[in-house]
A protein has these predicted regions:
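Conserved acidic donor-binding segment of nucleotide-sugar-dependent glycosyltransferases
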Residues: 323-336, 344-349
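A short, well-ordered alpha-helix in the C-terminal region of glycosyltransferases
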Residues: 344, 351-366
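Nucleotide-sugar-dependent
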Residues: 17, 209-212, 267-271, 281-301, ...
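Nucleotide-activated donor-binding/catalytic signature segment of Leloir-type glycosyltransferases, i.e.
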Residues: 243-272
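Membrane-proximal helix-turn-helix segments that form the acceptor-binding/catalytic region
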Residues: 25-28, 78-79, 99, 107, ...
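Conserved donor-binding/catalytic core segment of Leloir-type glycosyltransferases
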Residues: 6-8, 191-222, 230-232
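Glycosyltransferase donor-sugar binding loop
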Residues: 42-46, 229-247
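Carbohydrate-associated surface elements
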Residues: 161, 181
Length: 386
C-alpha cells in the first residue's frame, strides 16, 4: 500500500499564499512518487469551502465544517487525521489550528503515532506588530511557534534564515531547506518582452521598506529616469497600512508624485498588460527578520516570467537572484543608490534581456517544484527510515 501523508493547514486556499502556492504543489509532486497526499484545511478565511471535499488530481483536499467554534473545529481536524491514518503528518506553519493539532498529537508517545513534521515558511512572530494583534493573542501565537519548532520529528523550511534559527532551537531534528518553487509556465503564461517600456513595477504588501525609503527612492528615480512611472501594485496586509506611503508620496512637493500610479491588488489576468509597460520590476527590502525569514512566491514568479528584476540582496532574494538572475543591490544601499541601479538597468536594453533570460533559465533549473518535491520525498523516506 502506498504511504499516506496528511498536511494540516492553518487556513484555506484564499489570498494567503502558503497552502495554494507551496503545500499544494508539493503534494502534487509527492503523488507522482507514490504518496497519497491529503490537505486538511480549516477554511475560516474561505468560508465558501466550508465542509467541502474534492480531488486535485491525486491530492485529496478536505475542508472541515466551521460551525461550533474552535474546540469543535479542532475535534473535527483530529477526527480526520485519525481517519486518514497517515504515515507522516506534516504541520503547515506552527500556528492557529495547525499548531493546536500538533500540540495535541505530540501528547501521544512517539512509538504510538506517525512522525510529526513541521513546515515553516515565515517567522510568524514578526507579523504581530504589523497586524496589531492584541497582546494575549500575540503571546499565544509566539508560544505556539516556539513550542512547535521544538516539538517536531523533522522540519522543512523555506529560507536559510529559518534553517539557522530553527536548527539552533531544535538541533536534533532532521531539517530540509525547501524554498518555494515554480512550475514550467504554460505557453500562454504572461511573459516580459524586450523593449516593453520604461516604467518600474513595485509589488508590495507595504511591509518591505518604510514610507520614507519609498519617497526618497521615487524622488531619486524621477531625477535619474524622468520618463519612468513607478507602478505600485499590491494590497496592504492590514487595512490602512498603505496610508503613510500614500500620504508621504502624494504630499511631497516634487514632480515625482505625478509619476506614481497606485494599482491596488493585481491578479494574474492583469500581468500581461503590466509587463508590456515596464522595463523592470523592483524588490527592495530592509534587512529585518520579516524579510530575512520569508521566501517570496511573487519574486519567484516574476523572475520566471523573464522580467528584469532589481532586488535587495536580503534573505532568499539573494538566492533567487544569484548568478545574474537579478540585479542584486547591497543590503545597506540607500534609496538613491537603489534608484541609480534601476535607472542603469532601464537605460541598458542588453542588460534587461540578459537578466530576463538568465532568470527564467535559473528558476526552471534550480527551483522547479518537481525537483523540490523529489527532495521532500527523499526526506520523508529518511524520516521513516529512522
Amino acid at each position: 500500500m502506498n504511504p499516506r501523508v496528511c498536511f494540516v493547514a492553518p487556513f484555506g486556499l484564499g489570498q494567503k499564499t502558503t497552502v495554494w502556492a507551496r503545500t499544494l504543489p508539493l503534494a502534487r509532486v509527492l503523488a507522482t512518487h507514490g504518496w497519497r497526499p491529503t490537505l486538511l484545511i480549516p477554511p475560516w478565511d474561505t468560508p465558501q469551502d466550508d465542509d467541502r471535499r474534492w480531488k486535485d488530481g491525486d491530492v485529496e483536499l478536505i475542508n472541515i465544517a466551521l460551525r461550533g467554534g474552535l474546540l469543535v473545529q479542532l475535534k473535527r481536524l483530529l477526527y480526520e487525521v485519525n481517519s486518514i491514518q497517515p504515515d507522516i503528518i506534516h504541520i503547515v506553519k506552527p500556528r492557529a489550528h495547525a499548531g493546536l493539532v500538533q500540540w495535541w498529537l505530540w501528547r501521544t508517545p512517539r512509538h504510538q503515532r506517525p512522525p510529526i513534521l513541521l513546515d515553516a515558511d515565515d517567522w510568524e512572530q514578526a507579523w504581530a506588530p504589523i497586524n496589531r494583534y492584541p497582546w494575549p493573542l500575540a503571546r499565544f501565537l509566539a508560544w505556539q511557534e516556539e513550542w512547535g519548532i521544538r516539538h517536531a520529528d523533522g522540519v522543512t523550511v523555506a529560507s536559510r534564515w529559518l534553517a539557522e534559527t530553527i536548527g539552533r532551537a531544535n538541533p536534533t531534528a532532521p531539517l530540509l531547506w525547501l524554498p518555494n518553487g515554480v512550475e514550467p509556465p504554460a505557453p500562454d503564461a504572461p511573459r516580459w518582452r524586450a523593449h516593453a517600456g520604461k516604467d518600474v513595477l513595485f509589488f508590495t504588501r507595504f511591509v518591505e521598506v518604510s514610507p520614507q525609503w519609498l519617497a526618497q527612492f521615487a524622488s531619486s528615480l524621477y531625477e535619474k529616469s524622468p520618463g519612468s512611472t513607478l507602478l505600485i501594485a499590491g494590497a496592504p496586509v492590514r487595512e490602512g497600512l498603505d496610508r503613510p506611503f500614500r500620504r508621504l508620496l502624494q504630499e511631497a512637493a516634487h514632480p515625482a508624485s505625478a509619476r506614481i500610479e497606485w494599482l491596488g491588488f493585481v491578479d494574474r489576468t492583469q500581468l500581461a498588460a503590466l509587463y508590456n509597460r515596464i522595463g523592470c520590476a523592483i524588490f527592495p527590502a530592509e534587512p529585518t527578520i520579516l524579510q530575512q525569514a520569508k521566501c517570496s512566491v511573487r519574486l519567484a514568479n516574476t523572475l520566471l516570467a523573464g522580467v528584469p528584476v532589481v532586488a535587495s540582496a536580503v534573505g532568499e532574494q539573494a538566492a533567487y537572484g544569484a548568478d545574474g538572475a537579478a540585479r542584486l543591490v547591497p543590503v545597506q544601499a540607500t534609496p538613491e543608490e537603489f534608484a541609480a541601479t534601476v535607472a542603469e538597468v532601464l537605460a541598458t536594453p542588453a542588460q534587461q534581456r540578459a537578466l530576463g533570460e538568465t532568470a527564467r533559465q535559473r528558476l526552471l533549473k534550480r527551483y522547479d517544484w518537481r525537483m523540490l518535491g523529489a527532495q521532500l520525498h527523499a526526506f520523508y523516506r529518511r524520516i521513516l527510515g529512522n
